[in-house]
Design a protein with these regions (language model features):
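Short amphipathic alpha-helix that is part of the acyltransferase structural core
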Residues: 1-24, 120-154
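Conserved beta-strand-loop-alpha-helix junction that forms the acyl-donor binding cleft
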Residues: 91-98, 228-238, 254-260
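Conserved catalytic-core motifs of GNAT/GCN5-like acyltransferases
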Residues: 108-119, 247-260
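Acyl-donor-binding surface of acyltransferase catalytic domains
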Residues: 56-128
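Conserved donor-binding loop and adjoining core beta-sheet/short helix segment
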Residues: 1, 20, 27-81, 179-194
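Conserved acetyl-CoA-binding loop-helix of GNAT-fold acetyltransferases
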Residues: 71-81, 198, 204-220, 238-243
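Acetyl-CoA-dependent GNAT
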Residues: 46-47, 55-60, 140, 145, ...
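Conserved active-site tyrosine of GNAT-family acetyltransferases
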Residues: 101-102, 240-241, 246
Length: 260
């Protein structure tokens, strides 16, 4: 088996769509909105594509997405592309795959996470009229202020407001709860929720459930699969998502990785 660089969207998508729930993020990154920030590598055996990983450069730090149900193949691919990896990057890795990098890299573990997707036929609660509003790109400044207090250290890309798929609740002119997307692609029929947070003073009032439900209803008009990532020890968030109809589909680990 050998590795190759992949440049054909159709070939990548044909492979990834075999397990949409696991690969919502990389599938969404095939969209023209994200594609310029991507590098793709594949493991090939007798001309057949056996595994795919993605390096995404759309954030301040590159992010490696290396997720698979077949960790042996994923291990083999990562072993081959190790010399091509940047000196420092963030990573989403299937369980135990990190072992292939431990001899050449220093790894800082950021916890076990799980992937969840919204089950078909889920009943999403309706918010009161005008309680939740769609957030425009013009409100980027107010959104950044909200996240500094409510979700410090989060991965917020202001470009994502251009998708029109951010929703929030305001009080006194300021946001007190927001739900958004990390990935959104009607072309590839997927969306990944992200940056869901409530101001500390307004938690435990069901606001995150309201904004997330509103956003899911909006997204379901455009895409067929909605997913999200959440830390396994974030019990309140998981309870909120289960209430809305999300189900667990996989576990993975997040790391900051640097060459030794």
């Amino acid at each position: 088996m050998k590795y190759i660089s992949l440049h054909n969207k159709d070939r990548i998508y044909t492979f990834l769509k075999k397990d949409v729930s696991l690969h919502i993020y990389p599938i969404g990154d095939l969209d023209d909105f994200f594609w310029p920030f991507t590098n793709w590598y594949g493991l090939v055996d007798n001309g057949q594509l056996r595994e795919v990983v993605l390096l995404y450069f759309g954030q301040s730090s590159p992010t490696l997405l290396a997720l698979s149900r077949n960790t042996a193949l994923l291990h083999a691919l990562l072993e081959k592309i190790k010399p091509l990896l940047p000196p420092s990057f963030y990573a989403h890795l299937s369980p135990n795959v990190q072992a292939v990098l431990e001899d050449t890299h220093s790894l800082t573990h950021h916890g076990k996470h799980q992937k969840m997707t919204l089950a078909e036929g889920s009943t999403l609660p309706e918010a009161e009229k005008d309680e939740v509003q769609r957030i425009s790109a013009a409100e980027s400044g107010a959104v950044k202020i909200f996240y500094r207090t409510s979700y410090p250290g989060n991965w917020f890309d202001p470009r994502m407001l251009e998708s029109g798929q951010y929703a929030g609740i305001k009080k006194g002119g300021d946001f007190i709860s927001i739900a958004g997307v990390h990935v959104y692609s009607p072309t590839y029929n997927v969306a990944a929720l992200g940056n869901i947070a409530t101001h500390p003073q307004y938690r435990d009032q069901g606001l995150a459930t309201k904004v997330t439900a509103y956003l899911c209803r909006s997204l379901l008009r455009e895409v067929g699969t909605i997913g999200l990532n959440v830390k396994v020890d974030n019990k309140p968030a998981i309870a909120c998502y289960k209430k809305l109809g999300f189900v667990r589909v996989a576990e993975y680990d997040e790391y900051t990785i640097r060459k030794k």
